[in-house]
């Protein structure tokens, strides 16, 4: 695959169908705070977000002041609930496992780049398989999580490849912004919200039947767009 240095996969909503798990946990915390349910707009806001940003949305929705002690308890509850659900096993997104295997078989470096913290990511990796990845970068291991470019820049740095020669596979506007800001080409595979075509990305319905040639073509197309 000419020019393709690495493939950087997001986790939640891209490889595994875990956005619903997060949603369930966030609603539990919201109810613990005295709220009832997340509004559709708030749900969209939490997609691809990290723990602090999602918690802030839950507190806002509950109409409760985010005092340090209460916020700490809420964060613990959110992690505990999510960990329980992660341990039950997470379903793969369509075509995701085959896509990972295809890239690995071609000898192309692979990174997992997620806004989820290390503790929960390691729980998810029990089911996903850590062996699929050369490196994993978590939201609590960088100064700023997505939508900031830090996670993608760190992943490319750990792999020792230029980020501009990488394709990031993402499902959320938050993650896409992070990857595009970092300078990676983006293959967007929408999960919970629609993603529009744009100059820095190619949008596909799913990862089913994905070939290395398709990923290389994403890189070529994005480079052409940037020169246009």
Feature map (PLM): residue ranges:
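Generic anion/oxyanion-binding catalytic loop in active/binding sites
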Residues: 43-44, 85-88, 110, 141, ...
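Residue-level detector of short coil/turn "hinge" positions at structural boundaries
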Residues: 37-38, 66, 110, 132, ...
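Intrinsic disorder/low-complexity signature
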Residues: 47, 109-112, 137
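Conserved SAM-binding loop
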Residues: 15, 92, 110-113, 144, ...
């Amino acid at each position: 695959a000419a020019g393709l240095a690495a493939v950087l996969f997001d986790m939640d909503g891209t490889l595994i169908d875990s956005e619903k798990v997060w949603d369930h946990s966030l609603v539990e915390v919201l109810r613990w705070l005295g709220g009832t349910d997340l509004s559709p707009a708030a749900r969209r806001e939490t997609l691809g977000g990290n723990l602090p940003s999602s918690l802030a949305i839950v507190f806002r929705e509950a109409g409760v002041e985010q005092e340090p002690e209460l916020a700490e308890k809420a964060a613990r509850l959110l992690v505990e609930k999510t960990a329980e659900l992660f341990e039950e096993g997470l379903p793969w997104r369509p075509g995701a496992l085959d896509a990972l295997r295809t890239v690995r078989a071609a000898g192309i470096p692979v990174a997992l780049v997620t806004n989820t913290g290390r503790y929960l990511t390691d729980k998810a990796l029990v089911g996903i398989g850590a062996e699929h990845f050369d490196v994993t970068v978590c939201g609590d291991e960088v100064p700023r999580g997505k939508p900031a470019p830090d996670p993608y820049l760190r992943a490319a740095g750990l792999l020792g490849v230029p980020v501009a020669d990488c394709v990031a596979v993402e499902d959320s506007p938050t993650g896409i912004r992070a990857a595009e800001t970092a300078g990676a080409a983006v293959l967007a595979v929408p999960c919970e919200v629609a993603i529009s075509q744009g100059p820095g990305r190619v949008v596909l319905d799913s990862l089913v039947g994905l070939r290395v040639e398709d990923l290389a073509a994403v890189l070529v197309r994005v480079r052409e767009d940037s020169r246009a």
